[in-house]
Amino acid sequence: KLKMLKNFLYNKKAPNISLGGSFILTDQNGKIFDSSKVNLKKLIYFGYTYCPDVCPFDLLKISKIFENNPNLKKEIKPIFITVDPERDTIKKLKIFMENFDQSFIALTGTSEDIKKVLKKFKIYVKINKSNPIDKDYLIDHSSLIFLLDKNDSYIKFFRPNELKRNIALN
């Protein structure tokens, strides 16, 4: 355990952590996206388009990093995965992503597809509906950003406020 902690603290790949992996979802243009076919590292953020504050703010921070460091786009693919496939349709994602760097890809899928990906990353999600047919609701979810290697293996996670200083180190 001490070795694992030291590896994490010194920004090395932590051994024996089962997070991440390949996934297939649908992008904001309606095309199938297979993460295993992307020969870049992946920076993954989970959120939803109806989020009133945190998600758009975090995505804007990620977007600015890529806008200000164009060479990162040759190494890392920024990815937004919805935790709200019921409301985050392909059309909604396409409009939403117009606010961010063009290198970003937004992904959705069926509820089952999204649940599988959430499980791979151990993402906590709680939908706060006042009744089952409520369409205006908030979602509590993990707010972490994951970095995967070219083979979709976990490298590290960041909290949004740690991203800028750590992204260059990986």
Predicted stretch roles:
Residues 1-24:
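N-terminal targeting signals for export/organelle localization
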Residues 20-21, 41-42, 142-144:
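Short loop/turn microsegments at loop-to-beta-strand junctions
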Residues 24-25, 147:
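Hydrophobic beta-strand positions
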Residues 33-62, 79:
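Short active-site neighborhood of thiol/selenol oxidoreductases, capturing the structured segment around
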Residues 61-72:
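Short hydrophobic signal-anchor/transmembrane segments that target glycosyltransferases
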Residues 74-88, 103-112:
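Thiol-based oxidoreductase modules, predominantly thioredoxin-like and allied folds used
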Residues 94-142:
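Short, internal strand/loop/helix patches
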Residues 130-170:
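Thiol-/selenol-based redox modules, centered on thioredoxin-like
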